[in-house]
Curated annotation (Swiss-Prot):
Residues 260-350 form the SGS domain. It holds the Pfam family SGS. One of its GO terms (biological process) is ubiquitin-dependent protein catabolic process. Changing K221E: Diminishes the interaction with barley HSP90. One of its GO terms (cellular component) is SCF ubiquitin ligase complex. PANTHER family: PROTEIN SGT1 HOMOLOG. Belongs to the SGT1 family. This is Protein SGT1 homolog A. TPR repeats lie at residues 2-35, 37-69, 71-103. InterPro entries: CS_dom, HSP20-like_chaperone, SGS_dom, Sgt1-like, TPR-like_helical_dom_sf, TPR_rpt. Residues 149-238 form the CS domain. It comes from Arabidopsis thaliana. Keywords: Immunity, Innate immunity, Plant defense, Repeat, TPR repeat, Ubl conjugation pathway.
């Protein structure tokens, strides 16, 4: 049955009926979710519809299912080039070319990527400050494009060197979460059996360093850390929603421009919405490591540079048993491990 649907999808694709092709491939995937061919072919239909982030996600899934499927690398490279993700595209195309050296399409697209990367580097005029401010007040948490059809709420906040995206999805097993990072792409896919899949696949406001990005699946949410390629303040999470600015010390949160979305509905009170989000975060009941991480993060975000250095040094040197914010106290000595009352410190030899 799945193959019959895929055959009909191919016929629709040939007839330039790409929406129907996507729908039929999706039904085939529901019946056979481990077929890499279906994902690679749906990626091609998405490319025709100019849904490039969806195409990248499908190509990544096809590669995960079958790393030797050459056309999956071709689809990923093509979609990434459309998104101006030339380095990510080049990496995918080079991998595909290594599998099938005789395929001329790869060489042609790789040459095009090299040319576009060179042109992009020529156009880079972003000034880099000689010194960075010692303390920067992080912008407030910003609510993102929440629509009535969104399955899970998500939001982000940022620091000078990273953007942290939180998806509030409770009780999701780690194996049901698939997250990919591109040069300027984030792809979050949550697939729970018996439920509609959740997709968060924005083209990001700024470029990131994929190898330094990471994520963690917690009991109440998924936390994603995006390492910024440039030390700039993102005006939003998504591309094209405002100019980038260099961070300034102690910028008032009142100056931060909040996102406005075209709508026929009553204008939202973003100050009230932000207060509600912060209250939900504050009231959120976490346990174990998740609670400790939240506590540590909240203190760290509001600390100055000396406090952050003190916290990091004391926590690391004491093996997690001491957390100090006094740099004058801990900066000149080694912090010994101090077990809680009633517990004994033991050293293990391997």
């Amino acid at each position: 049955m799945a193959k019959e649907l895929a055959d009909k999808a191919k016929e629709a694709f040939v007839d330039d009926d790409f929406d129907v092709a996507v729908d039929l491939y999706s039904k085939a995937i529901d019946l056979d979710p481990n077929c890499a061919e279906f994902f690679a072919d749906r990626a091609q239909a998405y490319i025709k519809l100019e849904s490039f982030t969806e195409a990248v996600a499908d190509a990544n899934k096809a590669i995960e299912l079958d790393p030797s499927l050459t056309k999956a690398y071709l689809r990923k490279g093509t979609a990434c080039m459309k998104l101006e993700e030339y380095r990510t595209a080049k990496t995918a195309l080079e991998k595909g070319a290594s599998i099938t050296p005789s395929e001329s399409k790869f060489k042609k697209l790789i040459d095009e990527c090299n040319f576009l990367i060179t042109e992009e580097e020529k156009d880079l005029v972003q000034p880099v400050p000689s010194t960075l401010p010692s303390s920067v007040t992080a912008p407030p948490v910003s609510e993102l494009d929440v629509t009535p059809t969104a399955k899970y709420r998500h939001e982000y906040y940022q620091k000078p060197e990273e953007v942290v995206v939180t998806v509030f999805a409770k009780g999701i097993p780690k194996q049901n979460v698939n997250i990919d990072f591109g040069e300027q792409i984030l792809s979050v896919v949550i697939e729970v059996p018996g439920e509609d899949a959740y997709y968060l696949q924005p083209r990001l406001f700024g470029k990131i360093i994929p190898d330094k990005c990471k994520y963690e699946v917690l009991s109440t949410k998924i936390e994603i850390c995006l390492a910024k390629a440039d030390i700039i303040t993102w005006a939003s999470l998504e591309h094209g929603k405002g100019p980038a600015v260099l961070p300034k010390p102690n910028v008032s949160s009142e100056v931060s421009q909040r996102p406005a979305y075209p709508s026929s509905k009553k204008v939202k009170d973003w100050d009230k919405l932000e207060a509600e989000v912060k209250k939900q975060e504050k009231d959120e009941k976490l346990e174990g490591d998740a609670a400790l991480n939240k506590f540590f993060r909240e203190i760290y975000q509001n600390a100055d540079e000396d406090m952050r250095r003190a916290m990091s040094k004391s926590f690391v040197e004491s093996n997690g048993t001491v957390l100090s914010t006094n740099w004058q106290e801990v900066g000149t000595k080694t912090i010994e491990s101090t077990p809680p009352d009633g517990m004994e410190l033991k050293k293990w030899e391997i």
